[in-house]
Amino acid sequence: MIKRLYFFGGKTDMYDKERKAIVDFGKRLITEHLTSGTSGNISIFDPEKKLMIISPSGIPYFDTKESDIVVVGLDGKTVEGDRKPSSEWALHAAMYEAKPEARAVVHTHSMYCTVLACLREPIRAVHYVVADAGAPEVPCAPYRTFGTIELAEAAKDAIGKSDALLLANHGMLAVGKDLASAFGLARGMEFCAEVQYRAMCAGKPFVLPDDEMERVIEKFKGYGQVKNG
């Protein structure tokens, strides 16, 4: 059970790199149309100290400074920072508990992912890029009030093998080995959600079978350039 605790402290030089990354990617959430206003949130996880470096609550992304980024424990207790952390800190904590390899979480209210979430439809394998989430489809968690432990627990129960998740009548989230990976997955799933929605408007989309998706998932593991040494 995730508990809600707060303690506010000042900023040190700890996690300067992570703070900068969160500020930079927060701006990209807006410029790449993955969210609007102050909705959505971003975090990076330190697995050794079990700490989350997370965006603050209610500050526009282009107004957010590195000093606004908050460091909290998985219990929501603030370790460093003067700002209130994102209202969805428990959602992020639940993802790090569900996905031990995850080092970043991006939560958005991107248009087409949110449309499917309002239909309570998963992102199906209408386009093979869904396999980037590591599963044949991206599930949709049941609706729970935003910023609650109940939402966090529902998301944790629903995500399964996927690295992305729709939140009914709310939005989506993506996890990754680093912030760039989580952000890229969120962007990719928005593409897949748009393709699916547009196909649904035109007719009945053909969904790729699970065996083909498993093949694509395996091929994705070797996709891209191989690092030497």
Task: Indicate residue ranges for each PLM-predicted region.
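Glycine-rich flexible loops
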Residues: 10-229
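N-terminal amphipathic/basic-hydrophobic helices that include classical n-h-c signal peptides
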Residues: 1-13
